[in-house]
């Protein structure tokens, strides 16, 4: 206050809000605007927490900053000025002496922003009037905004601790309503939550997944290769007769070259060894006992020979391997006949393979032989009966019916009952088309084969 008696305004609102000054002495301010008069305070809206105790809302300035002041009804009743009955309307520009006031924080609610305001409990309206100057609000100051964020965070933390029913959705609603002070609310929300980063779940093992799928019954996984007979095993089983399936020697491991082989049964008439000019090897059957020879030839050998081979006068050689070790050819070689089972051992000859010197090449002229070609994959009931001579029938004994194996090679039991196949597998099987060569062979086989009659050598 100057010595001439004029009341001079000095800044005090910002310092009071920041806490650097205490409201111990009266503060002088200028009434810039009447936001809500005392007459409309009862029915009109108000930004104060309790509208029943608010008498008027004024905008007061200290010459540097402005602040919103809520004058209580008690303050209106105790104060006195000449135009009190008309309210604060028409008193803009006059000076106010705030004798008792306090700083409060308005939380954002109902579209109103969060801000600091002063609650005036006792004041005096001076007759001095000065020209009004527009000044910025104190809540726009950076230091005041920082202090406001701290106060909001403290207020929300206290309300959260005191009221356990405050949910996260309510906090988000408050953040949505108060876009201006969203940063402080975000910091408060992060402090209320436990942010530990992404949670990496432990990897689920195969056995854990199988255990979760099991519903009271044991679940086992068996490879399909153990439940199905491979093509090589099926080829070997189909190439053997009923007797050899139960009493024959143990077969070697399957060879991939067997996939293109066919079974050819050749019945040749008896002939003397001297007619060919080539001595017989040891282990071969004599002319009286040789009635049937079995040879596994490549499927390509059944086709027509090359033109260069057609000019040759020699017929197709009959390949038969002896179980014993063969010795070099000599005129003193033993000619002891062996049993039919020892001499007629199936031999595997891959395609385009030249017979070795240890194999017997029968070059003697023979009569046309009757051949039955059997392809792998046909059921046993569609196969033509094998030709048998009298000597072979007398030598062989009746064999028992072949029974399917009970266990796999690894000792696991066979499973002959399966669930119905899936729809996709049925569709794939129905979409398979047979090759024309197989269809032609099947038609020829059905039209020419006579199961009731037994072929005779020509």
Curated annotation (Swiss-Prot):
It is linked to Dyskeratosis congenita, autosomal dominant, 6: A form of dyskeratosis congenita, a rare multisystem disorder caused by defective telomere maintenance. It is characterized by progressive bone marrow failure, and the clinical triad of reticulated skin hyperpigmentation, nail dystrophy, and mucosal leukoplakia. Common but variable features include premature graying, aplastic anemia, low platelets, osteoporosis, pulmonary fibrosis, and liver fibrosis among others. Early mortality is often associated with bone marrow failure, infections, fatal pulmonary complications, or malignancy. Dyskeratosis congenita, autosomal recessive, 7: A form of dyskeratosis congenita, a rare multisystem disorder caused by defective telomere maintenance. It is characterized by progressive bone marrow failure, and the clinical triad of reticulated skin hyperpigmentation, nail dystrophy, and mucosal leukoplakia. Common but variable features include premature graying, aplastic anemia, low platelets, osteoporosis, pulmonary fibrosis, and liver fibrosis among others. Early mortality is often associated with bone marrow failure, infections, fatal pulmonary complications, or malignancy. Residues 265-283, 293-307 have a biased composition (Low complexity). It is found in: Nucleus; Chromosome, Telomere. It holds the Pfam family TPP1. This is Adrenocortical dysplasia protein homolog. The modification Phosphoserine is found at residues 25, 349. GO terms for cellular component: chromosome, telomeric region; nuclear body; nuclear telomere cap complex; nucleoplasm; shelterin complex; telomerase holoenzyme complex. Component of the shelterin complex (telosome) that is involved in the regulation of telomere length and protection. Shelterin associates with arrays of double-stranded TTAGGG repeats added by telomerase and protects chromosome ends. Without its protective activity, telomeres are no longer hidden from the DNA damage surveillance and chromosome ends are inappropriately processed by DNA repair pathways. Promotes binding of POT1 to single-stranded telomeric DNA. Modulates the inhibitory effects of POT1 on telomere elongation. Residues 333-350 have a biased composition (Polar residues). GO terms for biological process: embryonic limb morphogenesis; establishment of protein localization to telomere; intracellular protein transport; negative regulation of telomere maintenance via telomerase; positive regulation of telomere maintenance; protection from non-homologous end joining at telomere; protein localization to chromosome, telomeric region; regulation of establishment of protein localization to telomere. There is a cross-link at residue 381 (Glycyl lysine isopeptide (Lys-Gly) (interchain with G-Cter in SUMO2)). Keywords: Chromosome, Disease variant, DNA-binding, Dyskeratosis congenita, Isopeptide bond, Nucleus, Phosphoprotein, Telomere, Ubl conjugation. The keyword tRNA-binding does not apply. PANTHER family: ADRENOCORTICAL DYSPLASIA PROTEIN ACD (PTHR14487), ADRENOCORTICAL DYSPLASIA PROTEIN HOMOLOG (PTHR14487:SF3). Its main location: nucleus. It comes from Homo sapiens (Human). GO terms for molecular function: DNA polymerase binding; protein-containing complex binding; telomerase inhibitor activity; telomeric DNA binding.
């Amino acid at each position: 206050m100057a010595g001439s008696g004029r009341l001079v305004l000095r800044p005090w609102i910002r310092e009071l809000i920041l806490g650097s000054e205490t409201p111990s002495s009266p503060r002088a301010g200028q009434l810039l605007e009447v936001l809500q008069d005392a007459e409309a305070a009862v029915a009109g809206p108000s930004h104060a927490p309790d509208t029943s105790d608010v008498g008027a809302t004024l905008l007061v300035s200290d010459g540097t900053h402005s602040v919103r002041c809520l004058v209580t009804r008690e303050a209106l009743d105790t104060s006195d000025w000449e135009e009190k009955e008309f309210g604060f309307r028409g008193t803009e520009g006059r000076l106010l002496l705030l004798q008792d006031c306090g700083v409060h924080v308005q939380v954002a609610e109902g579209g109103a922003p969060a801000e600091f305001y002063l609650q005036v409990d006792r004041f005096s309206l001076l007759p001095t009037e000065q020209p009004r100057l527009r000044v910025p609000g104190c809540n726009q100051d950076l230091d005041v905004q920082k202090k406001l964020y701290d106060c909001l965070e403290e207020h929300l933390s206290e309300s959260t601790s005191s009221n356990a029913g405050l949910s996260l959705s309510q906090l988000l609603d408050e953040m949505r309503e108060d876009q201006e002070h969203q940063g402080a609310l975000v910091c408060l929300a992060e402090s209320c939550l436990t942010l530990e980063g992404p949670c990496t779940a432990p990897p689920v093992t195969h056995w854990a997944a199988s255990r979760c799928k099991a519903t009271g019954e044991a679940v086992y996984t068996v490879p399909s290769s153990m439940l199905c007979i491979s093509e090589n095993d099926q080829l070997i089983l189909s190439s053997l007769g009923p007797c050899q399936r139960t009493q024959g020697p143990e077969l070697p491991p399957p060879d991939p070259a067997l996939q293109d082989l066919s079974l050819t049964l050749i019945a040749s008439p008896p002939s003397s060894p001297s007619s060919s000019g080539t001595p017989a090897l040891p282990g071969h059957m004599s002319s009286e006992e040789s009635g049937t020879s079995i040879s596994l030839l490549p499927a390509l050998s059944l086709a027509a020979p090359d033109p260069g081979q057609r000019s040759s006068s020699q017929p197709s050689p009959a390949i038969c391997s002896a179980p014993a070790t063969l010795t070099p050819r000599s005129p003193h070689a033993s000619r002891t006949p062996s049993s039919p089972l020892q001499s007629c051992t199936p031999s595997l000859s891959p395609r385009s393979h030249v017979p070795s010197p240890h194999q017997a090449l029968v070059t003697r002229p023979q009569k046309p032989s009757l051949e039955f070609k059997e392809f792998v994959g046909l059921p046993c009931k569609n196969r033509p009966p094998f030709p048998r001579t009298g000597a072979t029938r007398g030598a062989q004994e009746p064999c028992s019916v072949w029974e399917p194996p009970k266990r796999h090679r690894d000792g696991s039991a066979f499973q002959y009952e399966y669930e119905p196949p899936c729809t996709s597998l049925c569709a794939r099987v129905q979409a398979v088309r047979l090759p024309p060569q197989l269809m032609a062979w099947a038609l020829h086989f059905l039209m020419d084969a006579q199961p009731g009659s037994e072929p005779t050598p020509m």
